[in-house]
Amino acid sequence: MLSKGLKRKREEEEEKEPLAVDSWWLDPGHTAVAQAPPAVASSSLFDLSVLKLHHSLQQSEPDLRHLVLVVNTLRRIQASMAPAAALPPVPSPPAAPSVADNLLASSDAALSASMASLLEDLSHIEGLSQAPQPLADEGPPGRSIGGAAPSLGALDLLGPATGCLLDDGLEGLFEDIDTSMYDNELWAPASEGLKPGPEDGPGKEEAPELDEAELDYLMDVLVGTQALERPPGPGR
């Protein structure tokens, strides 16, 4: 009887010890629970509860009190973590721009302005240099620079091969000469009486042209007058 009583007392003490071990982290006055932060305490408590729940379910004869205790603990943790998750995150205030950022922004603005001015100058220069210009080839000292044709003489200019002035040679040159000005200067004294009056307007009348008979007559008159005006010689 005595041995049985001792054995029963020992079994009661063994049952109390696991309960004390399992319930110490539920006491908020415990030093380990009080020193731990709320988030760390909740996470550690949740991990321990889940671990004990799985351990109890793996046993062949699970303890009902232990399961109820673990489930209540999990519900309490879930209720305490729900308001914290429901609260929206507090937006952090925007950081004030530092002096280095202001300097970088000003330097970037100055650099962009200088680049824009350089691009405008380059586009202006490209617009001016769009017309192709012949390159100056370097040749002997006697040769003109830039591919210019050498100086031609008068005969070379008149020649048909050059094509500078004429294409038909000297005959075309004489055909193109207008001799009317020379005729007017030659017969100007004789034809003064035939000139029209002063020009009154833009529609002036041209001087009548003289035919060959009139020219011969004028020549005879001029020759006769010159003979009459010539003084006789001393022997006559």
UniProtKB/Swiss-Prot annotation:
Residue span(s) of domain SERTA: 38-85
PTM section of the record: Polyubiquitinated, which promotes proteasomal degradation.
CC terms in the record's Gene Ontology section: cytoplasm; nucleus; sarcoplasm
Single GO biological process annotation from the record: positive regulation of cell population proliferation
Keywords: Transcription, Transcription regulation, Ubl conjugation
Listed InterPro entries: E2F-SERTA_domain_protein, SERTA_dom
Any single Pfam family the record assigns to this protein: SERTA
GO molecular function, one term: transcription coactivator activity
Complex and partners: Interacts with the PHD-bromodomain of TIF1, TRIM28/TIF1B and p300/CBP. Interacts with E2F1 and TFDP1; modulates transactivation activity of TFDP1/E2F complexes. Also interacts with CDK4.
Name assigned to this protein: SERTA domain-containing protein 1
Species per Swiss-Prot/TrEMBL record: Homo sapiens (Human)
